[in-house]
Amino acid sequence: MSTPYEPEFQQAYKEIVGSIESSKLFEVHPELKRVLPIISIPERVLEFRVTWEDDKGNCRVNTGYRVQFNSALGPYKGGLRFHPSVNLSILKFLGFEQIFKNALTGLPMGGGKGGSDFDPKGKSDNEIRRFSQAFMRQLFRYIGPQTDVPAGDIGVTGFVVMHMFGEYKRLRNEYSGVVTGKHMLTGGSNIRPEATGYGVVYYVKHMIEHRTKGAETLKGKRVAISGSGNVAQYAALKCIQEGAIVKSISDSKGVLIAKTAEGLVPEEIHEIMALKEKRASIADSASLCKKHHYIAGARPWTNVGEIDIALPCATQNEVSGEEAAALIKQGCRYVAEGSNMGSSAEAVEVFEKSRASGEGCWLAPGKAANAGGVAVSGLEMAQNAQFSTWTHAEVDAKLAGIMQNIFEQSTDVASKYCDSGSNNIPSLVDGANIAGFLKVATAMQAVGDWW
């Protein structure tokens, strides 16, 4: 594969290929080598112009994308991201990761991703509404409940999802589950806002139970969290509910480090949620910054002190190799990515070396640890298809079961095809990559995508 202008996609591709080639998979199934050059190319890439009107009446233009990467297991499924950094490399990386993440859930979903370089920050609600509707007017021809089902991601809130859903309904004159993350009154699912954050915590609980053979739980564990969007917010709340101590939360402007022994408390997380609803920064809260330690322009990892667990929940490549080494020195034993590819390639290498050598910082990759969001999106699709709504408890139980299954798939496949190192802790990175790849490759062969 030669794509020097697509560094994020290259990184994601090399991670998958590295896991597979370093394992025994191709010794057992040499025919699967033929899949790699095929699976690395999207089935379809859409790029389109989005023109919209700002509050001053000016015509504005942005670029929109949808990468429909792989549909062997089901309709394309993956979020839409509105952020000025969005480009084809980032969306191909996210779509590629989504293929394997969706496969791990066991639900009938293919992989895709989309978005635009539109920046919601600094825009009025009316401008965001007009852009969202204009975006859907370009995208609606290529999506549908049986074809491609987008959802939210960075910059695409429930407000945006609902305006896109409404525009699709008007354009198609039909009421269907064409997007997920909808309002409960319009076919949304219980637990969807919480799903990714809750899922990360459920996954970490299985890591702790597996490693300690049930002797330890989350209770009393010190947790560093980055980000302050949905994933970070609900991961923090679930950690607190499980008796853990949340030591940090952050945004693009800086990090808030807890100064109290109890860590951040639910009321403070809810205050941060209210700030984010107004598209404000943590730094805008004088009370939080006075009670705790706010560091402008910083990330948690080298500032948080001694911790047991790190949950990167902000964006890709947010943990560098140096920060990974610092986390290990600070006593970190578990890292679970709430963000997609949250650890840089160098950080993954540091964590995996630690795991294999016996120091034992155990990394859970995003495609496994943060699959809870798309899992509940899949459950929302199922509810829409049945014209039914499941209770909060029903969806939460299904989410917990899916996260347990993903963990068990990852450990079982890693144990079968990979060397676990001196401490016999299986590589969740390799296990998740290989387990997802096996499912997709088998389905692709069944539908004639390779032979």
Swiss-Prot record:
GO CC field: cytosol; mitochondrion; nucleus
Tagged with keyword Phosphoprotein: yes
GO molecular function, one term: glutamate dehydrogenase (NADP+) activity
UniProt-listed Enzyme Commission number(s): 1.4.1.4
Alphabetical keyword list: NADP, Oxidoreductase, Phosphoprotein
Modified residues (Phosphoserine): S252
SUPFAM superfamilies found in the cross-reference section: Aminoacid dehydrogenase-like, N-terminal domain, NAD(P)-binding Rossmann-fold domains
Catalytic function, reaction form: L-glutamate + NADP(+) + H2O = 2-oxoglutarate + NH4(+) + NADPH + H(+)
InterPro entries named among the record's database cross-references: Aminoacid_DH-like_N_sf, Glu/Leu/Phe/Val/Trp_DH, Glu/Leu/Phe/Val/Trp_DH_C, Glu/Leu/Phe/Val/Trp_DH_dimer, Glu/Leu/Phe/Val_DH_AS, Glu_DH, Glu_Leu_Phe_Val_DH, NAD(P)-bd_dom_sf
Active site as annotated: K113
SMART domains the record matches: ELFV_dehydrog
GO BP annotation list: ammonia assimilation cycle; glutamate biosynthetic process; L-glutamate biosynthetic process
Family per record: Belongs to the Glu/Leu/Phe/Val dehydrogenases family.
PANTHER family named among the record's database cross-references: NADP-SPECIFIC GLUTAMATE DEHYDROGENASE 1-RELATED
Subunit structure: Homohexamer.
NCBIfam families in alphabetical order: PRK09414.1 (NF006929)
Protein name (database record): NADP-specific glutamate dehydrogenase
Phylogenetic lineage: Eukaryota, Fungi, Dikarya, Ascomycota, Taphrinomycotina
Gene responsible for this protein: gdh1
